[in-house]
Amino acid sequence: VDYTLAPDASIPEIVDECRRAVGWLHHQADELGIDPRRIVVSGSSAGAHLAAMVALPGWQQAAGLPADLVRAAVLVSGIYDLAPLVGTSIDIPLNLADSEVESMSPARATLDGFPRSLVCWGEVETTEFKAQSREFANGLTQAGTTCTVLEVPARNHFDVVLDLADPTTDITRRVLSVL
């Protein structure tokens, strides 16, 4: 999804854009030749955060969409709790309010009904990215979601997605198993 970037849009506006994009896919499924019951969201880094926000249950009904809109989520090297960003240079364009940290952090949300997921990260990620990924995956499992975790050996935050171009890698096989 080609969403508006901060500071031109707030995190809630960006999340709304992504949710509307997936809603559009659902509504246009026949025209696009896709099965609206097989929508999978995926993202890396900030994209994983946005994919998790789209996969969160609870917003779909108000948008006139089925509760099970998203069949699965593939989340790579994401940030799921925005609190550590507050006061950092990353927060300058985001300008996160406390209420946004709470409402826009998937790790702080009720995860009951979250679709099956693959949560992965690179072995050479920062401690914070690894911790957030592990904690979010644990939260999903505790909520009853089928969640597969994968630490990709010898990969960092920026090159972990490169393995997705190779059909023989573990991450690609795991992604395909979620589909």
What are these regions (language model features)?
Residues 1-179:
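Alpha/beta-hydrolase superfamily serine-hydrolase fold, recognizing
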